[in-house]
């Protein structure tokens, strides 16, 4: 299977990129986050997280307080095909970390759904539960399509192949028992162009609302949102763990009233062999109060990255370094004592 992320940098590359012994600075070390297509939510969010937690030698805000990641670590965001591809790349060690929806990660750990062919992805561990994503169904502004049921016999893009949008949109069509005439799997940018040109009738977009691409299309009168609601949504939520009823609020896009839909949570995942102390430092930096202004000023849904979502992490394994941090801040219960371990004399 083709990997969407460039291989060659394993989890926490410990070889120094530059060394400054005269200045007594730590060596630079690289750490990647596999994200998704540029027009989606994952790439800008990956770039923001990278800025928040990176700790290049000599950066003033990192030296003044413990609000950055491990000294010398430079975090970067990499584009990819999306969630499924990110999970596979993290599991096999061809990328350090990645973003993926919680339901996709749960499928990977269990070896079901999109991972039935590749089998259980046993090396995946979770660093953080980051933010919710809303499924947004776009059709032409002049289209008669008013519901998911109206997609029957139409031309529909599900998003990038092997992306979270592809996985969840497929589940939506199944739950509503809808069979489009043609299914397309293209990036959001291409899907938007195809909709403008009348070459498809609708496309699914999974990400934070508002999104720049959708705001532009809605604002120009080229597209409108269609609700995902009713009995079909109820069947979908009952079938797919990790999905919940949600809505896009009034005013999220110009002239748009509230739109019923579904949402899921995005996780930051890493391989199980990542050093616990390094993962601890990265997670601590992400939630450090000193970094809160950077998240508040970031693109939607960066504002949703906050402590308090760790309950949803329990369906998939936490990385030990992350678990240690959550225990220390009271988000997880303390580690119970081992009754078979003899106390030191």
Task: Show where each model-derived region lies.
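An extracytoplasmic/periplasmic, membrane-proximal ligand-sensing/linker region
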Residues: 190, 197-198, 207-220, 225, ...
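Secondary-structure end/capping motifs
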Residues: 59-60, 175-183, 192, 236-237, ...
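Bacterial N-terminal signal peptides that target proteins for export
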Residues: 1-9
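Bacterial N-terminal signal peptides
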Residues: 8-16
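Pocket-lining segment of extracytoplasmic ligand-binding domains
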Residues: 102-104, 112-114, 143, 179-274
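Bilobed "Venus flytrap"/periplasmic-binding protein-like clamshell domains
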Residues: 30-65, 129, 133-197, 292, ...
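Immediate post-signal peptide segment of exported/extracytoplasmic ligand-binding proteins
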Residues: 21-34, 68, 145-155, 320, ...
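N-terminal (or domain-start) structured segment
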Residues: 24-101
